[in-house]
Amino acid sequence: MTLIKSISGIRGTIGGGAGEGLNPLDIVKFTSAYATLIRKTCKAQSNKIVVGRDARISGEMVKNVVVGTLMGMGWDVVDIDLASTPTTELAVTMEGACGGIILTASHNPKQWNALKLLNEHGEFLNAEEGNEVLRIAEAEEFDYADVDHLGSYRKDLTYNQKHIDSVLALDLVDVEAIKKANFRVAIDCVNSVGGIILPELLERLGVKHVEKLYCEPTGNFQHNPEPLEKNLGDIMNLMKGGKADVAFVVDPDVDRLAMICENGVMYGEEYTLVTVADYVLKHTPGNTVSNLSSTRALRDVTRKYGMEYSASAVGEVNVVTKMKATNAVIGAAGNGGVIYPASHYGRDALVGIALFLSHLAHEGKKVSELRATYPPYFIAKNRVDLTPEIDVDAILAKVKEIYKNEEINDIDGVKIDFADKWVHLRKSNTEAIIRVYSEASTMEAAEEIGQKIMDVINELAK
């Protein structure tokens, strides 16, 4: 059993004793801490908190515990039940609520679940707020409501429709062009909430031919739910059979978007944003943001339009903060998560799909041909395992000194930008490891520079 508490929420495997896994006792404690914080920080004239969940088997149980706890803390609960992460984020602002709790472990296997915490803007708590939730939970500084001040409960299942309406209302979503293109689309929704909302979105976009794979929201994931090539053999084979022009694959909570070309080849998750950004910048030039571990291709496309690209620390809340600071028109937290402020400040696969199909319809190209128009980059992901007594920060400082003549960014670990490649080193908060991400114009070159830096780290660790 596993239970992980961090500034971004609490996640774990279902079952076990107190503190061993994600069980009702820990859920009550953490929900109470969040409810206490929001009571202090919310500036909205509201007593509502929204709760939404993905289709995990444990979702109903976890939701019932969360809802009861919030009501016990005096909050009025709006239960939108089976809903994507971006749907829940939008529901918070549409309801004028003080916050929201999303019950999803994202791309983790079915035995996992988690509580992700939102503020009154439908955005994730920042590090300071997350730490305060952890402190309150540890100190058990809770004050439950008396019998005359218990919260109320309301179920509202209209938010999937409202989410789709908001996507179709975006200026750059060209429904008529998509209809005329007569696209054939395949989807893999890993038997979670994407299976509820994506078919409806595509129908509303005028896509008449949809091949549906794993769209029953049972929570029994038919493959590892992380949308990586090694997990997507079924839909890739379907595409190789010529069944569709493009395939869209989402994770269980529908904030990540991966795509597959008409020939069965992965489009590349990093290029989801690059392509959508190209379309957005063409029509509404502006700045862009992604995290330090994301492809350089976004920078290249942004500069093509004479605009400025900025990199943030890893983590959606950091990307959003940087986007607001730079007035960015589009951004991403990596892994195919498109953040489009014209809709809302959160990763949203529905927005990504609608903008991508609009772009594809305007370009009149095959998906593989469109992909070939962007700069070719390849990212290698590795790690260096160290012993617990080693000072990881000291090693990173030495690496920074060794490469001081290169362009260095140290807002989140150490990123070394060479002329034609980069390496990003990040320490883990929970393990004695350094994650090593590297990018170059070929996978061989990316692996080579990554290995070179790993050799330096291992030498420094002796």
What are these regions (language model features)?
Residues 52-54, 187-189, 261, 342, ...:
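Short glycine-centered, acidic/aromatic-flanked micro-motifs in structured strand/loop junctions
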Residues 1-68, 72-73, 152-184:
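An N-terminal, well-structured beta->alpha segment
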Residues 244, 284-462:
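Phosphate-binding and adjacent anionic-ligand microenvironments
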Residues 36, 48-112, 200-260:
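N-terminal small/polar loop signature for handling phosphorylated ligands or for N-terminal nucleophile
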Residues 117-120, 258-262, 339-341:
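Short beta-strand-to-turn element immediately C-terminal to the catalytic PLP-Schiff-base lysine
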Residues 13, 113-240:
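Gly/Ser/Thr-enriched, mixed-charge loops and adjacent short helices
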Residues 131-165, 169, 261-334, 339:
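Proline/glycine-rich low-complexity loops and linkers
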